[in-house]
């Protein structure tokens, strides 16, 4: 008997950065396949796993505020979780502002 599995990746990510000088914005572009969705970042306790971001510490770089979505999520009651849930379909951008103490020595490779 043979068994095969496939890793499903219904969300593809691209990351870009914009901004001048000391303050920059990291933009996480999510492309969501039809039939799938990406849960919002603020799902209530007892619900599904929310979308979250974690960042490594980089010397002379600090996070400014929280990751913010570019639009409000679609909201709908879920009988499975017995609560109102938010999610995104198709595409969504999440943004994180960073502050760089010395932009001349900051390089992305």
Where are these regions (language model features)?
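Extracellular/lumen-exposed scaffold segments
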Residues: 3-109
